[in-house]
Amino acid sequence: MKYTYLIVGSGLYGATIAQQAKKAGKSVLVIDKRPNVGGNIYTEKVEGINVHKYGAHIFHTNNKEVWDYVTSFVDFNRFTNSPVANYKGELYSMPFNMYTFNKMWGVVTPEEAAAKIEEQKKEITGEPKNLEEQAISLVGRDIYEKLVKGYTEKQWGRDCKDLPAFIIKRLPVRLTFDNNYFNALYQGIPIGGYTKLIEKMLEGIEVRLNVDYLENKEELDKLAEKVIYTGPIDAYFDYKLGTLEYRSVRFENEILDKPNFQGNAAVNYTDRETPWTRIIEHKWFEFGKDSEGNDIPKTCLLYTSPS
């Protein structure tokens, strides 16, 4: 049998294309080199907790059509992302808002906060020449030093003075007490995890796992009229122009025999000395409850570090 489409990768993009193609009456084969569907949004159940295997993913969109589409497969919870920044034991709200400014400077009104930021931004004159100058021109020296500099340098493995200014086009500054990281109208986490969402989207579609497309390209290309490839583009072209400078990360998992480690789904570590950039405590994506609504006695952590 020759398929209309061979879709390489079973992440959100691949699953969406596959589902829509099948709906349009096309024949589809989905392959993935991993032993599971879901790509980088894959979740697995550990100790009753849906663990985000490849880092945290919070679904958010302003597009009602998109929201209606994903919620037609599974229900979503009401999770909103409100990360915390930890700078050497000092805790700050993210994104930068009035809670952040009050902790940083003791200001209590939006007018005071705006004046403080404007005062510190004056340090930079002219066009910012690097990321450090760009960040200071947006939020001032204090916030840059505690909440931007170390975190960014860990992520990129370079001094902020050696990074281009365009990496930080803008830094969201809110003169309100709104801790919601995203401004999107619709946001949440699929109840039961992202893997459940992908499995629902791929119902009735042939899926082959543990298949490496690039190692079997010539043979696999014969199976379909068209190929839709969703993997790394430099790998597809066999690195003929070199490798792209992806920001790569390393994940380390830990299970603790305690109900609560940090009290929040995401805590960013913004000092340069702490080796990891973020700790994810997965249970708080679903409010610390299992699928039956019971409190979970253990907790699962994901340490994210630059590799």
Predicted feature locations:
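N-terminal Rossmann-like FAD-binding beta1-loop-alpha1 element of flavoenzymes
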Residues: 5-29
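Short His-Asn-centered micro-motif
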Residues: 8-10, 31-33, 61-62, 192, ...
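Glycine-rich FAD pyrophosphate-binding loop
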Residues: 23-44
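A conserved beta-strand/loop capping segment in the N-terminal third of enzymes
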Residues: 42-51, 59-110
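Active-site/ligand-binding neighborhood in enzyme catalytic cores
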Residues: 85-92, 98-226, 230-237
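Central helical "cap/lid" subdomain
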Residues: 210-273
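A glycine-rich beta-turn/hairpin centered on an aromatic-Pro dipeptide
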Residues: 264-267, 276-286
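Conserved small/polar residues in nucleotide/adenosyl-binding loops
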Residues: 303-307
